[in-house]
C-alpha cells in the first residue's frame, strides 16, 4: 500500500483579506516577504508551497502565532493540482 504524501497550502481568502486590511499590493507582499511572483501566485491559487514560504508570507502580513492556522493547512498532496 502506497503511503500518502502531505503538503502545505495557504488560504487565499485570508491572504487577500489581510492584504486589503494593510492596503498592501501583490508587489508589496512580494517585496516584503522576499518571494517570487510565481510563489505568491501558487499560494493564492491554494497550491502546495514550502513552509518557508508560509512563514515569509505570514511574517510580511504581520500574522501572529495565535492566528497563523487561519492562513494555512496541511493536506494530501495531489500531483494533478500541486505540480508546478
Regions found by a protein language model. Name each.
Residues 21-41:
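Short alpha-helical DNA-recognition segment
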Amino acid at each position: 500500500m502506497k503511503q500518502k504524501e502531505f503538503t502545505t497550502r495557504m488560504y487565499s481568502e485570508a491572504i487577500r483579506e489581510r492584504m486589503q486590511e494593510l492596503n498592501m499590493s501583490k508587489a508589496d507582499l512580494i517585496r516584503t516577504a522576499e518571494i517570487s511572483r510565481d510563489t505568491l501566485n501558487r499560494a493564492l491559487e491554494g497550491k502546495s508551497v514550502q513552509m518557508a514560504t508560509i512563514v515569509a508570507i505570514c511574517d510580511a502580513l504581520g500574522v501572529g502565532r495565535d492566528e497563523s492556522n487561519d492562513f494555512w493547512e496541511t493536506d494530501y498532496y495531489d500531483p494533478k493540482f500541486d505540480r508546478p
